């Protein structure tokens, strides 16, 4: 399913070749072209893209649950985005805006700030953007949340054609093209407005090639509009052949003409869809073979965005799900069987925002990097690092030569493109300056990451007027009526809540519900030790992870851990596990040597719900027996083309299996989940979506003839 997908991704981005003129404007030496107009770039942006897409008149009609999606083919210095964001703020519509942009040669945050410095009216917006802007050396999708979730920016660093293909592949522009019969979730939302932008067609023809517009058409609908500054004949023909109807009008300033218009029909609309695969699928198949569609659902044309939701589970996964849904205008009932939030693995005093980082190129390492970057942005943008923890940095120690090579490569790659990189390689002799104590090896320091108190975070996430918390409420059964409403019931059939959708966030206990009983998860016991700080350890001002982990002391106590105990289920604190944690700390730093009386040492025991492939399980819940019957052909041959959508429970989702990385994984995974629920274009790559998908285990077991 995924090995061939790996070749679609580049290991690093292509740096922009640019110079700056006396006015501080960037100029591309590679394309011999300006990034924006040298006369009045902002006025041109408003004239071409904002006015010709009629944004100010369209936005007031949005409902509070609608998302308006803008897609741009060249981010450049971000001027178009800031102008759109400013107009959105001044219009103050009820819904949300999702701005998607592609950039093959991304500028770094310092270059973005310098380029935008010319417009003081954007100073506040530019500062927010640059504070959350991803490392320019990291390829792929990067999702940024602004204005408390009302504005979302998804950047794709890499070739626009590849990025557009990812969106098409993930969202089901496959078969039945003319009526969009397959999608992620119950209903698909497509692009509302296109900004076709980039260096001029004569100097950068790749961004204006016909397949760009054909891919754009596959993500468009009858109300989709477009605008572009150019009227070149090759662009006109490509736009028209892709199914867009164009108008030619006088351009801005000295530019003679420009194009704008609407989408009419897909060029394959009059062709048998089963014999006419889309551009993305033809390109994919040429490189990688068969593209499966088991992750897609048959679209429900009558589906409306959910107004109510049940979230089962009050740990990190449930709190994040409730928070994200509430921000989208959903009234959430959160059911927790315990008397308070965060009772399971989410109950530690301190937890690090941690994933295992590398540039090895495998799917998990790419997800880890994306999750780490998004989690840190999320906790900063919502101020959770201030209210529930501290972004004092995390040092990842090089515990082997192989790990040192990986971590050093990350630091060097980021240092080569960013003047103030998020990731910094620190030599062993310099670690004391970085974290406060000298460590046994060098490591990778993530300056904007840190630790959080999971209990406080769960309370902060669920502190929203649209979230109702019901404790001592054990949802043992789920039932759906003929109208699609979900009911959460106790063992004896007592109704706890009803809603349009349900999200299961109960870690391994999801196996106790009939709909998710087959999910492959196991519990791994972990014990954390609470250690009294001493003279040397009090110098620690950042978190350190290696053989174990430790965070700076709070109220004189360090939280350190954690043991991994397979096939054990005791909740009792054990002296041997305390000693295990203490020994690991001593191996990391002589300053982190502790000798407490083990018999009285305090700590915490929890159980991590892990999956066989280490990815969490996030997305719509498949109907197991129907899935196996529909895709039975995979038992004979994994590459069998079965152009059918998968069978899924309408309105039932799951978010479990985060293991020990809940703080790092849940923000991005939950954002992807909500995009699925609302049919929004995904903020993650197709590869990542398939690795998170709950049906992936059924697909794999069928191809291996295990079920």
Swiss-Prot record:
Per the UniProt record, which EC number(s) apply here? 2.1.1.61, 1.5.-.-
Q: Where is this region: FAD-dependent cmnm(5)s(2)U34 oxidoreductase?
A: 312-707
Record keywords, A-Z: Cytoplasm, FAD, Flavoprotein, Methyltransferase, Multifunctional enzyme, Oxidoreductase, S-adenosyl-L-methionine, Transferase, tRNA processing
| Principal place of residence | cytoplasm
Annotated region tRNA (mnm(5)s(2)U34)-methyltransferase: the residues are 1-264
State if Oxidoreductase is listed as a keyword: yes
Looking up Pfam families in the UniProt record yields:
DAO (PF01266), Methyltransf_30 (PF05430)
Task: Report the catalytic activity.
Answer: 5-aminomethyl-2-thiouridine(34) in tRNA + S-adenosyl-L-methionine = 5-methylaminomethyl-2-thiouridine(34) in tRNA + S-adenosyl-L-homocysteine + H(+)
Q: What is this protein called?
A: tRNA 5-methylaminomethyl-2-thiouridine biosynthesis bifunctional protein MnmC
Taxonomic placement: Bacteria, Pseudomonadati, Pseudomonadota, Gammaproteobacteria, Cellvibrionales
Recorded name of the encoding gene: mnmC
